Regions:
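General beta-strand structural signal in soluble alpha/beta enzymes
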Residues: 16, 40-44, 76-79, 108-112, ...
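Acidic, Ser/Thr-rich peripheral helices and adjacent loops at domain boundaries
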Residues: 59-64, 152-169
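Inter-motif core of Ras-like GTPase G domains
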Residues: 124-146, 153-163
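Walker A (P-loop) phosphate-binding motif
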Residues: 2-36
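Phosphate-binding/switch loop-helix module in NTP-utilizing enzymes
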Residues: 77-122
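G-domain G4 guanine-recognition motif of GTPases
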Residues: 112-113, 142-144, 162-181, 187-200, ...
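N-terminal phosphate/diphosphate-binding loop that engages ATP/GTP or pyrophosphate donors
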Residues: 30-84
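Canonical P-loop GTPase G-domain recognition
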Residues: 203-229
Length: 229
């Protein structure tokens, strides 16, 4: 199943939060939507790396955004980040808010969270940074974190342990991850990425059984998801 159908992505602003493949989801979903004839603006409220083959618009001129969308179908609207993130080549929030971009592009996909490249995370009080106008939040979970010690696989392990009632040395189970997702109540739907074996898929199915939001699982790198419920 393609990503749009598996995640029920609608026109307007969609926020991508969590860990384990947010930027990959933005890139693959944008390409999929572009291939269907839609225009897509990529944005962030935190930081992300530039997208290969996608024009980056750093100004606040809406005509420049329109031109980039007309030329390539997809435009990244962001500015070079400051400090260590900028030194690493990352981009930060652009001059045009996602709600403004929604008047220019059919779809606006926003990376609204950070995870320090770890497969799992819990959220601090100020996270995620979901922008005004966002109609849904897709939470990405990295299946590679299942079975790994919480202290090694989770961004903000102390918060994770508080919500899941576990210790940093415990392994991250689907039950613990589900407890955190339920307690936070941030997700409109969940995507379990890195499901490239029966063990990972079994963990995703267990997660789905414990949640009351739709769950899809598969490989974002391959552009493949299966809707579990």
């Amino acid at each position: 199943m393609n990503l749009q159908d598996a995640l029920c992505i609608r026109p307007g602003v969609t926020s991508v939060i969590g860990s384990g493949g947010k930027s990959t989801l933005l890139a693959r979903l944008a390409e999929e939507l572009r291939a269907k004839g839609a225009t897509v603006a990529l944005a962030t409220t935190t930081h992300f790396m530039p997208f290969e083959g996608v024009a980056t618009v750093t100004g606040h001129d809406v005509d420049e955004v329109r031109a980039a969308l007309a030329a390539g179908g997809v435009a990244c609207v962001a500015v070079p980040a400051e400090g260590p993130a900028g030194a690493a080549g990352k981009l930060g929030p652009g001059a045009l808010a996602p709600a403004e971009l929604a008047r220019l592009a059919d779809y606006v996909l926003v990376e609204a969270d950070g995870s320090r490249r770890l497969p799992l995370k819990a959220h601090a009080a100020w996270e995620p940074v979901v922008p005004a106008g966002s109609t849904q939040s897709v939470l990405v979970v990295g299946a590679s974190g299942f079975g790994q010690p919480v202290r090694e696989a989770v961004h903000r392990p102390e918060r994770f342990c508080e919500l899941a009632r576990c210790s940093p040395d415990d392994v991250a189970t689907p039950d613990a991850v589900a407890a955190v997702i339920r307690a936070e109540g941030l997700a409109s739907r969940v995507t379990v990425n890195q499901c490239e074996g029966e063990g990972a898929l079994a963990c995703a199915r267990r997660l789905q059984a414990l949640l009351d939001v739709p769950v899809a699982a598969g490989s974002l790198r391959e552009g493949r998801l299966e809707r579990l419920g």
